[in-house]
Amino acid sequence: MGNSSSSGSHRPPRPASSESALPPAAAAAEELSSYEAACRSDPELRTFDTTLQRRTSRAISTLAVGVEVRSLSLESLREVTGCLLDMNQEVVRVILDCKKDIWKSPELFDLVEDYFESSLHTLDFCTALDKCLKRARDSQLLLHVALQRFDDEEDNDAAAAGQEDAAPSARYARTLHELRQFKAAGDPFTEEFFSAFQAVYRQQLTMLEKLQQRKHRLDKKVRAIKAWRRVSSIIFATTFAAVLICSVVAAAIAAPPVAAALAAAASIPVGSMGKWIDSLLKGYQDALRGQKEVVSAMQVGTFIAIKDLDSIRVLINRVELEISSMIDCVEFAERDEEAVKFGVEEIKKKLEVFMKSVEDLGEQADRCSRDIRRARTVVLQRIIRHPS
C-alpha cells in the first residue's frame, strides 16, 4: 500500500486533456466551417490559406523523420521555428494593414473646416442678399408713392383742365419724379452681388464633390470591413496550424507533458485574440459610422444649400425681369400725358406681382440662412456625440 502510495506520489502529473486545452469539438468544427466558407468567398484569405497550408505541410514533412526516430535535428527545429515566425509575421502584416486610427483623420477635419468656412461664406451672401432686398423694397416704396402722386394729380384734373396744352411733366410732374427715381434706382442686384453669388455657388458645388468623394471612400471601407473577419480567420487558422505543428514536435521528442503545454499555450490566443479582434472591429465600425454620420450631415447640408441657392437665383431673375419691365413702363410714360396714364396702369398691374416676388425672395433668403445654421448645428452635434 505504502509502496503504491510512494510510487504514486512520484508519478508525473497527468497531462491536461486536449478538451480542456482546445476549444470544444463542436465549436472547433463550427469555426473551421466558418473559416472554409470565408476562404471560398475571400480571394485574399484564400491566398493566405494556401500559403499557410504549404508552410504547415513543409514543417510537418520535415518533422516526419524525427517522429520515426523519436528525435529532432537542429535543421528540423529551424524549419519549424521559421514556419511559425512566418505565420506570425503574416498575421501582424494583416493586422497592421487594417488597424488605423480612422476617427482621428486630418483629412476629415480639413473637410469639416472647409464645410464650416463655405457655410459662413453662404451666410455672408445671405446678408448681402438682405441688403439687395432692402433696395428692392425701397423701389417698391417709390412706385407706391408714384401711384399715390398720380391719383392726387388725377384728382386735380379739373384744375389742370385749363392747361390742356401743358406738357405732361407739368400735369404729372410729381408722378414722373417718383417714377424717374425708381428708374434711377435700377437693378438692386449689383455686379458685386452676382460675383459673390457665383463664388459661393461654386464653393458649395466643390464642397459637395469633395463630400461625395469622401463618402465613396468611406463606403468602400465599410464594404471592406470583412477584412476584420479575415483577420479573425487568419488568427484562427494560424493558431490551428501552430497547435498541429507543436503536437508533431511533441510527438517527435516523446514528451506528452510538453505536448499538452504547447497545445494549451497555442490555444490561448483563440479566445483572447478573438475578443481583441471583436473589440478592434467594434472600434473600426464605430469610427466609420462616426465619419459617415459627419460626412452625411455635411453632404445633406451642402445639398440643401445648393438647392436654396438655385431657388434664390430663379427668384432673383424673376425680380430683375419685373423691375426691367416696369422701367420700360416708366420710359414709355415719359413720352406724353396719355403715355403717363397708360404706363401707370401697366405699373399697377405689375406691382402686385413684383411685390410678391420680392416677398418670396425674402422668404427664400431666410430659409437658406436657417437651413445653413441648422446644418451647421447638426454637423457639430455629430462630431460632439461621437466618442474621440
Curated annotation (Swiss-Prot):
This is UPF0496 protein 1. The keyword Transmembrane applies. Keywords: Coiled coil, Membrane, Transmembrane, Transmembrane helix. GO terms for cellular component: membrane. It comes from the Eukaryota. Residues 198-227, 344-376 form a coiled coil. It holds the Pfam family DUF677. The lineage of its organism: Eukaryota, Viridiplantae, Streptophyta, Embryophyta, Tracheophyta. Residues 1-25 are annotated as: Disordered. It is found in: Membrane. Belongs to the UPF0496 family. The chain crosses the membrane at residues 234-254, 257-277. It is a multi-pass membrane protein.
